[in-house]
């Protein structure tokens, strides 16, 4: 699967939009997410949806890389190559599937 500009990646309630892409890399910037409600009866897990084009800053990336974008190498561990991922430090960013992203606030 080819990644193209405008594609959205997610990780635990955080969203990132692709601004440039090649066959092996993607340059991403963080975008805002909107709170959609609780995902469990106790209120620990929260659902978020992305707001495409509303760029913001991300503490994981830092201010400078948030503004100009961060280039990351694409990975795909599936046999048919249809689930691209980006690795940013220890975080794995998966291509957003359209479902709300779940952020677990229970620590």
Indicate where each model-derived feature is located.
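Basic/aromatic-rich interaction segments and small domains that mediate binding to polyanionic partners
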Residues: 23-38
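Intrinsically disordered, low-complexity, charged/polar segments
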Residues: 36-107
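Short coil-to-beta transition motif at edge beta-strands of beta-rich domains
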Residues: 1-11
């Amino acid at each position: 699967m080819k990644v193209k500009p405008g594609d959205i990646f997610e990780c635990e309630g955080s969203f990132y939009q692709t601004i440039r892409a090649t066959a092996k890399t993607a340059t991403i910037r963080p975008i805002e997410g909107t709170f959609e409600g609780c995902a469990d009866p106790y209120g620990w897990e929260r659902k978020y949806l992305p707001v495409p084009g509303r760029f913001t800053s991300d503490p994981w990336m830092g201010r400078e890389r948030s503004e100009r974008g961060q280039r990351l190498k694409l990975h795909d561990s599936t046999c048919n190559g249809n689930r691209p991922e980006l690795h940013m430090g220890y975080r794995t960013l998966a291509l957003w599937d359209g479902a709300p992203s779940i952020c677990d606030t229970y620590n």
